Amino acid sequence: MTLLNSYFGSFGGMYVPQILMPALYQLESEFVLSLKNLQFKKKLANLLKNYAGRPTPLTLCRNLTKGTNTRIYLKREDLLHGGAHKTNQVLGQALLAKQMKKKEIIAETGAGQHGVAAALSCALLNLKCRIYMGIKDIERQKQNVFRMKLMGAQVIPVKSGNGTLKDACNEALRDWSENYINAHYMLGTAAGPHPYPTIVKQFQSVIGKETKQQIFEKEHCLPNSVIACVGGGSNAIGIFSSFIEDTSVNLIGVEPGGIGIHTEKHGASLICGETGIFFGMKSKVMQTHEGQIKESWSISAGLDFPAVGPEHAWLDSIKRVTYVSITDSEAVHAFQHLSKLEGIIPALESSHALAYAIKLMNNYPNKNQTLIVNISGRGDKDLKTVEKFLNK
């Protein structure tokens, strides 16, 4: 029996080989204890403040919105140490691993941001680290691969399947099933088997807590909308968590539309997927009629995933969050637009959320509206990808 509810409505669960159940129960037990442990909380708060650089600012876009009545604020997770929101939860998981007396960390990565965050947390806390990464992602994220290796991590190329995040996840789980006694699997998003979606949400909820306090200080009221990109869904659930009960706030999750959701080349699992079992969970998954997992597609490596975290599937089913899609070209345009007008280069993942905010602004230029966009990471890693896309 689990200590916490392992489902969000009908989504979630622990669909893993029996051999991994003791490791998941141990992790859940340690997590529950940590929530009551003042020393653990102090350690994590200290690392977030003095190592990662929290709180991150909430920045008003003054040039982007000129000539409209829209106010767009950016939650600046791009300024966090490591370059993305991923650092928030890896520090929490690394501390849990230390408490469980684990010596090694296993991780997966797509865009490389979770890999970088895992590597830096392991360097800091003296843990061995091996990271699985698809060969397609290694090719498009060479800078992050070098950063991981520089911090002492072993990067293991995954050649199976399409050589992307899905395949890296499968290999990481396979490794963990053989080495769970000494190793902790540091999952990178709010997906996978229970208790991972709950753990990752807890450690990413700092984004939403800060944002809510900051927007009240600046506007003295709640925003009209909070917008975040959704791949696995950790940055989105992190910022949404503080606003879910505020029903006047529109929560908008932006999925990767790729070349278009009418094609086979996209990653919009909530919009186009069906309920299925994948990666140890029941959620919305891109699959064939026979139940085979489809290959996802996105210009953004971090969104190139054929499923979504179970809480997002539940929030979609109860219509608390609206899920939309943005194409590769729309995301690249937003990437250029913010860079040119505000001097902020966002990650391609975050550019999907930004593109939808720009769409709302352009569709309702005279409407008084306050939008918050979670800039989940910085775009240095994507410069070559964007350059290649623009030179096509």
Curated annotation (Swiss-Prot):
Where would you find the membrane-spanning parts of this chain?
A: none
- Where are the N6-(pyridoxal phosphate)lysine modifications? K86
Keyword list (alphabetical) reads: Amino-acid biosynthesis, Aromatic amino acid biosynthesis, Lyase, Pyridoxal phosphate, Tryptophan biosynthesis
Name the cofactor(s) required for activity, per the record. pyridoxal 5'-phosphate
One GO cellular component term:
cytoplasm
Q: Which pathway does UniProt place it in? A: Amino-acid biosynthesis; L-tryptophan biosynthesis; L-tryptophan from chorismate: step 5/5
Source domain of life is Bacteria
Describe the task this protein carries out.
Answer: The beta subunit is responsible for the synthesis of L-tryptophan from indole and L-serine.
Q: What is this protein called?
A: Tryptophan synthase beta chain
List the gene name.
trpB
